[in-house]
Amino acid sequence: AFANTGVEIVSIDTYLFSLYDEDK
């Protein structure tokens, strides 16, 4: 997540983080 070691992880993390951020 915070440690971008892969494009896939970054994409998924960004997506989930967006939902989490909007959810607050």
Curated annotation (Swiss-Prot):
Transport listed as a keyword: no
Post-translational modification note: The N-terminus is blocked.
Protein species of origin: Olea europaea (Common olive)
Family of this protein: Belongs to the glycosyl hydrolase 17 family.
Keywords (A to Z) from UniProt: Allergen
Domain of life, source organism: Eukaryota
Disulfide bridge partners, by residue number: none
UniProt-recorded name of the protein: Major pollen allergen Ole e 4
Annotated transmembrane regions: none
